[in-house]
Amino acid sequence: MEMKDFIFTSESVSEGHPDKVADQVSDAILDAILTQDPKSRVACETMVTTGMAVIAGEITTNAIIDYPKIVRETIREIGYNDSAMGFDWETCAVLTSIDKQSPDIAQGVTEGEGMFKEQGAGDQGLMFGFACNETPELMPMSILLAHKLVSRLADVRKAGVLDFLRPDSKSQVSIQYIDDKPVHVDTVVISSQHSPEVSYEMIKEGIIEEVVKKIIPANLMDSKTKFLINPTGRFVIGGPMGDCGLTGRKIIVDSYGGHGAHGGGAFSGKDPSKVDRSAAYMGRYVAKNLVASGVCERCEVQVAYAIGVAEPVSVMVDCNGTGKIPSKRISEIVREVFDMRPRAIIEQLDLLRPIYRKTAAYGHFGRELPEFTWERTDKAAIIREKAGL
């Protein structure tokens, strides 16, 4: 059998990337609303550009929210605190245009209304979950390292270790795989916004020493590993001044970095009645527990819904040929162990809480924070038992 030898690349972006600023603002607003009224319906979109943030969407809530204050606090925490950056939390304009959720949608989602008694899905659509045993977090290594690089960039910026850095940055990691196992980091790309007076040599040396070498395992690098640091040579203009940022523009960064499939729905700014978010989290929960159980080494789960209907129209489990038991039995176990109806997902994962701002940068998956209930592997034992392993 021919050996599989290929290079796979994933990217991530920092909390200061304009699209991620928008995601974090949308989720900060969602958290503020859920804190006061957990049953709220929220679809909050954000656009950020030079000197301005625009908030729009459909929100039905009893909460009383100071939208400009939340927007400004989020921008301040990210680090846009100087008008020289073209975006400053104290001076940026905040425009809002908020409507209520359509009653036609609401009756299909609200329990006891619409054509079905149970709480239905907030929309039609297909969502995917993924897990693999490449890393202890059961995430693909390329996206995990890409997230850790930009997270480290933010840490050294805020701590003053590399005080010339500014908030906007991106990373990209290319990994050589042999027979689907990561063996070598081929290329690391980092682009980070910086203050105008610093030399390129200082930027490159600082990022390689304080970021790359602190994150990329030494055993995966050698003399052939390529480091491309700020490859244009200059990155002073960045953030919302450099590019307009929009909620939901980084769906592959938010999920699995190109590994597995994606249904197209974004996460941020959406309350958990929206299955784009809650069912994607549930898909990760199912896939991660299957891999953690030892039933398979790699797993992709697809779930699909019709608007207003509680039961999924389909659930698919694909172990990419790594299953230790027949695929049909794995699918049966998933149906026996996991309830994929929207209300059940919300209850199992405890999603009516203000936990979403943390998800909005550095990945929704693979970060084992206490709030990230979909990262638990508490179903692995019962899966093993049912599989007879």
Swiss-Prot record:
Its main location: cytoplasm. It catalyses: L-methionine + ATP + H2O = S-adenosyl-L-methionine + phosphate + diphosphate. GO terms for cellular component: cytoplasm. It is an enzyme of class 2 (transferase). GO terms for biological process: one-carbon metabolic process; S-adenosylmethionine biosynthetic process. Its cofactor is Mg(2+); K(+). Signal peptide: none annotated. It comes from the Bacteria. This is S-adenosylmethionine synthase. The lineage of its organism: Bacteria, Pseudomonadati, Thermodesulfobacteriota, Desulfuromonadia, Geobacterales. The gene is metK.
